[in-house]
């Protein structure tokens, strides 16, 4: 089983997909039926759809196979030769069946091979089966040696918490041998932790006819388990094993013994669980029908009117019936599964699918035993047949789960035993699936929300299988989907007093008796009913998020569980953020209006609407509220309901929603009141809320450009390619751009691409064409000034236009410029057109990016959480010191778009925070080398094109960058356009994966803890200071702070921010870092936060780079002379070069350890607490004097004789 964990994490290795031509040319070769192929090895089952035909002996006559195309040509030449045709053997019946099954059942041979390999990895190793068999023999002998007698006090604690304990229990040794149950019996054990369930039946002599009442049976079962455990511990065969008690399925009435063997060969992955059961004939079956009561009110000292009927205890009755009917149900499963490898493998596929989604956990879990019973049910109904393959078993179960309704009840009982009681029994449960006895509901504890979620996941699996353009295997089986990543909001209540308050004041006596005073299901029912009534269409599902109970030592007292609850809310994006809840009309339905007013309390008010109706209504906000505020409406409703109906204080509740939206809010240090604009700006605004202002301004500018008179050429199209146009700019864009001294100053520029009409008068020389473009831009600027009164400025990149406080950079796009960039003349004078980095960059910016930008804008319109998810993701990457030169911003946008496009969840993401968590999962668990991220916008890619691209990617992986992204607009550059080999590099991808895994661990830890506080943004959005060799601190007054919320630095503390407006389009620090990387990337890696970061972290390359080497003229870059005529790259020399390049920005250099020590020792730490007085002169002095003085103070020391580095010389 050592490989099980590996296969669940990584999945099977990538298999090359043959081109379509090859698939149609020869079906046998496409399906891998070559006689020498490894696929010819017999599979483990003859009925699972995966066994290859047994190879037949070859004829004695030798034949020669020609390679590749030569073989095809030879076949065509010999098309009509009868002698060669005689050598072609017709396919056998087995081969025909194999071809038909592969064509009908699977997408491709790749999907079939992946499923087959996974099933082979999941098979139990022989050492485990042998150990289990030997253990069962030993345990059987042990039970026969047990002696009858009175159970006295022992060192062990009885693993059951009850109010009234019994005494005088007499132990009787088992009369029936222990038996394997569950997966161990059906042959479907699943790792990596193999749990073997063993049932030991308690004889009837231990029980009396009235023990079904008031938890007496449960106490005797726990005492029986305690006695057996005590005897096992004293037996030499088990004395070295580890013993612990636990609750089965988080049910405090179901204690089991967990035994971990001491044998080294199995102790790491094997665990045995001992269940105590009772004979089915112990009690009358009629005692446990759902409408009977088996826990009297007097047991809890409650008073009950004798004239009233006792409340039903259907859930407790089902708990006892589970033990009584276990043997009968297990016999049915054994009959269906033993010897049928296809059913066993099908159930294994379903168990992997269910476990990856965490829907089988806890008290309310949809266990795998339900799936096993459902397979038997489908076989009884003749929907599944004995010859169905394992794939058909899994697919049929998913299809039937998605299209059948269990709320009305289904049953395994024989037809003769089915009565009209099925519908009656279904009325006592949310979901009803009766067992073979017709008495036990296998889904007694499954709430309706969990069942509907299972159905939705099953429907998604079928849809993925039906999508012929997609390899659905990783989405169904490989991707781990924790439940907290599937929900949009989480409600968490862990305060003990609040839990007890809800149980005492709001739990009905019937619920207490029904669940034997177990608090968790009572809380779940109270909260679910209340929230469903209040939220209505705003939520699609309310799901319990359970943590599996932990085992405890057998000497310790049984813990009390169920004292906390977590609920996950899956929101409906169409209705979740509506600001109004409208009640019934007070005139037409006064009773309904009064009930509405009572339910909502003081929040409800009588209102008159535009249609003249007068109704009660609750208003949660205004239509003008920012999207981030609207996303908190559900939180506002839930908190009000809990306070109004359950009297809970807000301090005792944690509602997890939009905590991470803080990272793209406007910094409180920046005051919007100082911005001169006609726009209404709020101090608590954010980047998402400000984006529409920029988009509206751009639309107005586009109209003005189209309306310009007397232009030499007509403007055909205008496209914005800035991130803000697709709601992907994480920095708040404020209307603060200004014209100062004939220059435009702005913190952001919005890039606009203008396409002109066709003309044959453009010059054929590149520099002349660009000069003409500049002249055209100048004319546009002059006309904008004359006709629209807009200020403008020309730069080497394009035309800067100032409008309403926003700065736009206009660029002209013309096909001829792209052709001239590609043009090359060979030595023979032949002109050809070849792609090069410059031409690709121009084609991307002018022609592809406008289309992709429009597609991403449309994606945000259909999924409003897409934009804010990108904002959070970009901020997280930036705070990990990953700037645009290391990780392209478009890579983040496309990866998040891939999340929103792929159908790996039944519901769309409604909350940006959930989208970000899924983005972290994508970074943490992606196979960068084997995965090509395809974005098929508007489904414009055909299946053939997708197949060809995937084949090219797998067959020529080295020609693609480490992170391969492809959109349907990339044309021939698909997979190579948005990233490069160094941006991001494979090392950076590995680094980001580690960071993402660490962030997910922090999130999971905070969710699983009893602490009400969710992980703080400052914990997630602050990079680590570990691993860096040097930190260069920059002058804080020369590096403007970002307008977004400052989450701090991993190196130093906060200081007074500055918000200087730089020249439009200028980023001096980014330019310097680019120079450093161009010149010194072979010796050091450079990291900084592009969102206002004021430190430059340096990581040296491995020591081998700095070792002395022989003197060579061609290898003197950054070298210094050393002994014996050798040269060496000296780190100190490089540091001096860094200082020279940084010039005025450089403040000081130190190691991270020194900074930590200074922070600990400094009493009043600031962001730059060691700056010299000369560097902090009064702001009244001119900037030139200030920079000159700082440069003089920080002038580099004189160096010894060395060879000046060539990169530095060239840069100067």
Swiss-Prot record:
Q: Which family does it belong to?
A: Belongs to the NRAP family.
Q: Which UniProt keywords apply?
A: Chromosome, Nucleus, RNA-binding
- Compositionally biased region (Basic residues): 1197-1212
What GO annotations for molecular function exist for this entry? Answer: RNA binding
Specify the domain of life of the species encoding this protein: Eukaryota
The UniProt subunit note reads as follows:
Part of the small subunit (SSU) processome, composed of more than 70 proteins and the RNA chaperone small nucleolar RNA (snoRNA) U3.
| Record Gene3D superfamilies | 1.10.1410.10, 3.30.70.3030
Where's it found, cell-wise? Nucleus, Nucleolus; Chromosome
Q: Which gene encodes it?
A: Mat89Ba
Q: What is the annotated role of this protein in its UniProt record?
A: Part of the small subunit (SSU) processome, first precursor of the small eukaryotic ribosomal subunit. During the assembly of the SSU processome in the nucleolus, many ribosome biogenesis factors, an RNA chaperone and ribosomal proteins associate with the nascent pre-rRNA and work in concert to generate RNA folding, modifications, rearrangements and cleavage as well as targeted degradation of pre-ribosomal RNA by the RNA exosome.
GO CC term (a single one)? small-subunit processome
Pfam (any one)? Nrap_D3
Q: What is this protein called?
A: Nucleolar protein 6
Secretion signal span: none
The region called Disordered is annotated at 1-72, 1156-1212
**InterPro entries in the record, alphabetically?**
NOL6/Upt22 (IPR005554), Nrap_D1 (IPR035082), Nrap_D2 (IPR035367), Nrap_D3 (IPR035368), Nrap_D4 (IPR035369), Nrap_D5 (IPR035370), Nrap_D6 (IPR035371)
GO BP annotations listed: ribosomal small subunit biogenesis; rRNA processing; tRNA export from nucleus
